[in-house]
Each structure stands twice: as structure tokens, then as C-alpha cells.
Amino acid sequence: MRRALFSCFCGLLWISSGWAADPLGTININLHGNVVDFSCTVNTADIDKTVDLGRWPTTQLLNAGDTTALVPFSLRLEGCPPGSVAILFTGTPASDTNLLALDDPAMAQTVAIELRNSDRSRLALGEASPTEEVDANGNVTLNFFANYRALASGVR
């Protein structure tokens, strides 16, 4: 019995010494890939959306910071993955870079367009809106407001 145990012990020593062979050395592994967001699509009725901010007398925008009434608008997104979504608006910034410049600066040189979230807080240009939950069908409606804002006194 002792001889059998001794033989097993010697066998284990021989096996363990085999595992302690020379190390493999340095191995370099380069991994490449891309991770992309699954994005929503804009409802076809909202792709070329026009939001009419109205016609206002210059007396409505006499001083810097004066605004016109808020005009609501919404964007409908479809085919979204489960979870929540947010969007951001880009465009030509006004002198206050949180606001959108008008296309025709001769029209109103001291006026810009202000965007607001559904809670009416300002949505700065280039910043993500608050998130909205996607419904079970992959749809979500994002609600916003827009208005004119005077950048300085003496709107022309």
C-alpha cells in the first residue's frame, strides 16, 4: 500500500513539473470593432417640419431678453429600441451661442430663436434634451417649444 502511495506521489511530482515548463512569453492581441447606437427614424410627417413662430411687432422685443409667446411643436420618432431617447438641435448659433441665429440677419439683427423643453426650460443649442421613454411599439413623441428672443435692445 505504501509503495502504491509513493508511486502516485512521484507521478504527481512528475506531472506538476511538466506544468511548470517555460512560459509562453508575450502575446499581443489586437481587437477591432465598432459599437453603434440603434437609432430611431423620424416619422415621415415630421421630416420637413415648419414651425411658424408668428408675426410680432418690434415693440414685443424692446429690451434684451424679451421674448415672444411660446409656440409648441413635436417630433415623432419610430422604430426606436426599448428604453429612452433624447435629441439635440444643431444649427448656426446666434451671438448667444445657446440660441439659433435667424437665416436672414437683415430681417432682425438682434433677435434669435430660443428652444425650450416640454417643461419650458431652455434647451441650449447642441445639448441633449431630457430623455423620454419609448412605448411598447418603439414610438415616442418629443415635445418642445420655440420663441423669438431679443439679444439686445433696439430690435430692428
Segments predicted by a language model, with ranges:
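Bacterial N-terminal signal peptides
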Residues: 7-16
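Mature extracellular/passenger domains of Gram-negative fimbrial/pilin and adhesin proteins
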Residues: 2-4, 19-156
